[in-house]
From Swiss-Prot:
Contains one covalently linked phycoerythrobilin chromophore. Homodimer. It holds the Pfam family Phycobilisome. The lineage of its organism: Bacteria, Bacillati, Cyanobacteriota, Cyanophyceae, Synechococcales. This is R-phycoerythrin subunit beta. The gene is cpeB.
Length: 175
């Protein structure tokens, strides 16, 4: 080890001596809260298939006429696109909750979402309703995941409002 390297280590050791127990507790609390938040967000991606499938199914049950008209979700192709997009949207919301990187909203998959539904003949009101149902299910999933955790849960209200905000941004792309 060189002299300069050992001096650097000694200097860092002296700096660490100035860290109080309160600072260490604050750091531990920050790490625990961040880990809990990541666990909650991870539950969204783990349940994305079920959330998307349930939302599409619920929308069809609410709109029986949507499966009987000319512009319907009656084909396998249209249904698979809705399910695929639902899962993609949930992953995008998860990414936004972690990174808050708004550039993902300008990506082609979201910019062309409205055009895709129009080309397939999927009524935009139905697509919007699916995303609203997904938002509600995601928030419910977040609440149940966080409530089963031990420790501080103060981050939940911020996480829920941020989730609602991100879904609203995506829903507004369809309007």
């Amino acid at each position: 080890m060189t002299v300069s390297k050992s001096n650097q280590i000694l200097s860092n050791d002296r700096d660490l001596e100035n860290i109080s127990n309160k600072n260490i507790e604050d750091i531990k609390e920050f790490i625990n809260t961040a880990n809990s938040r990541l666990d909650a967000i991870d539950s969204i991606t783990n349940n994305s298939h079920a959330i998307a499938a349930d939302a599409v199914t619920a929308m069809i049950c609410e709109n029986q006429d949507s499966v009987n008209t000319k512009i319907s979700l009656d084909t396998t192709n249209k249904m698979s696109v809705c399910l695929r997009d639902g899962e993609i949207i949930l992953r995008i919301v998860s990414y936004l909750l972690i990174s808050d990187d708004e550039s993902v909203l300008s990506k082609n998959c979201l910019k062309d979402l409205k055009n895709t539904y129009l080309a397939l003949g999927v009524p935009l009101k139905n697509a919007i309703r699916v995303f609203e149902l997904m938002r509600d299910a995601t928030i419910s999933d977040l609440k149940s995941t966080v409530n089963s955790m031990k420790g501080e849960k103060e981050f939940l209200s911020d996480l829920i409002s941020n989730t609602e905000f991100q879904f609203e941004r995506i829903i507004n792309l369809l309007r």
